[in-house]
Regions:
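Alpha-helical transmembrane-bundle signature of multi-pass membrane transport and export proteins
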Residues: 2-435
Length: 435
């Protein structure tokens, strides 16, 4: 008995989507990462609500994000160089341990009634410094868990775990902040780091993929920027990614203001974050199922993010806002996963840490610019515009980037029209013109 093409495709898709999980080390790591990031999103949600309660201003929430992500902007690429030169597993063990200490200190100070806004800002800076080194090491370590042909899938699953945890984390924070208070949510987050520390210690290091470490010396920022500027495709992707990352992903500010001032519900903030998390998980898994990621997938999901963001900003009811938040998360996660995959596809092993760090700078490190701007717009122009302006800028950036890529992939007509036209064909991508 033979299987139909439909049956074959239906059984192949799930295995393609989760093919990285056939490795025990990858299963251990992703399970621990899921538990840990659920706790992280609990803390982020509780922190935004706490700062807003203390000040009543979205601008203060934006300043908190500035403190958290400014170290990423200043240290991100250098931290990526450290990840390229040293054992990424050891770096992740150290940074994850320090993140647990930061969360425990935050919770303890709150429970002792010693936590003030200046202390929140200082601990946010501490969090940012640790995260600047954790991000490239942890994300770069994912590549060591799987075979080279599975790197794109593993990175997409990593994005799915990181963004999918937003479904559970904010929902738990919204439900438990009232009865438990923010302090115990911070303590719970500290405890969740054991879920990622144990796999890092318990995994079989003999099954890790060999990596080429970068040599010491050089100028990591200049090297990474030089590599990108030499590749027009990567350059366009990074510029669009930077614009969108700066202005479109400031959800702790814009969704908080939208939930409280537009719909009068603090708990709706957690529900909106959870809805974007649901969409994010779907978008990441869809991207993970694709054998190769093109720039057209990147631009298409950027457009989805912009359009659905506008719909969310001016949603007429709370439930309409929740429904609109799902495609916002889907487009946003697929957009981020596509950028990560394109960088990995186009970069050598000894440059990946720096390029991942540069991508993190473009996406997270620009938050010190976008978050205060978003908070100021929320306080002075309204919650709708704090989300709407970023969506509009996203559509403009995507349209310009798409136009540049479209022009660069069009076949060139020779000066002698009697000569046949030539095109560069990418057979690995289904035989189409190289995007």
């Amino acid at each position: 008995m033979t299987s139909s093409p439909e049956q074959l495709s239906s059984t192949k898709a799930p295995s393609m989507m989760f093919r990285s999980l056939r490795h025990r080390n990858a299963r251990l790591f992703f399970f621990g990462l899921l538990v840990s990031t659920v706790g992280t999103w609990m803390q982020m949600t509780a922190m935004s609500l706490l700062v807003y309660e203390l000040t009543g201003r979205a601008t203060s929430v934006g300043v908190t994000l500035l403190c958290q992500f400014l170290p990423m902007l200043l240290l991100g690429v250098w931290a990526g160089a450290v990840a390229d030169r040293h054992d990424k597993r050891r770096i992740a063990l150290l940074t994850q341990s320090l993140l647990a200490v930061q969360a425990a200190l935050l919770g303890t100070l709150y429970l002792l009634d010693l936590l003030t806004l200046p202390i929140v800002y200082v601990l946010s800076v501490v969090l940012g410094v640790i995260t600047a080194f954790d991000n490239p090491a942890r994300r770069g370590f994912v590549i060591e868990l799987v075979e080279p042909s599975e790197i794109t899938n593993a990175l997409s699953l990593n994005t799915a775990v990181m963004t999918g945890s937003r479904i559970v984390g904010p929902a738990i924070a919204a439900g438990l902040k009232g009865p438990l208070g923010a302090g115990w949510l911070f303590i719970i987050n500290a405890a969740t780091f054991t879920a990622i520390l144990w796999p890092l210690l318990a995994m079989d290091r003999t099954r890790l993929q060999p990596v080429t470490r970068a040599v010491r010396g050089g100028t990591p920022v200049r090297d990474a920027l030089r590599f990108i500027t030499r590749d027009r495709r990567l350059l366009v992707v990074f510029v669009v990614f930077t614009v969108v990352g700066t202005f479109a992903f400031n959800y702790p500010v814009s969704l908080l203001k939208l939930a409280i001032t537009r719909f009068g519900s603090e708990s709706l903030f957690g529900i909106l974050l959870a809805a974007t998390g649901l969409g994010s998980m779907v978008g990441s898994l869809i991207t993970a199922a694709r054998p190769r990621i093109t720039t057209w997938w990147f631009f298409g999901n950027g457009a989805l993010l912009g359009v659905s963001g506008l719909a969310l900003a001016w949603a007429p009811t709370a439930w309409a806002a929740v429904l609109c938040a799902i495609p916002v998360g889907l487009g946003g996660a697929a957009f981020v996963a596509a950028q990560n995959a394109i960088v990995q596809q186009e970069s050598p092993a000894d440059m990946r840490g720096r390029l991942l760090a540069l991508g993190a700078v473009a996406f997270l490190g620009t938050t010190p610019i976008g978050a205060p701007v978003t908070g100021w717009i929320a306080d002075n122009a309204g919650a709708e515009w704090s989300l709407g302006y970023g969506s509009m800028l996203t559509l403009v950036a995507v349209a310009i980037g798409f136009a540049i890529r479209w022009r660069s992939t069009r076949p060139q007509v020779p000066a002698d029209h009697h000569q046949p036209r030539t095109m560069v064909v990418d057979y690995a991508d289904g035989g189409g013109v190289v995007p």
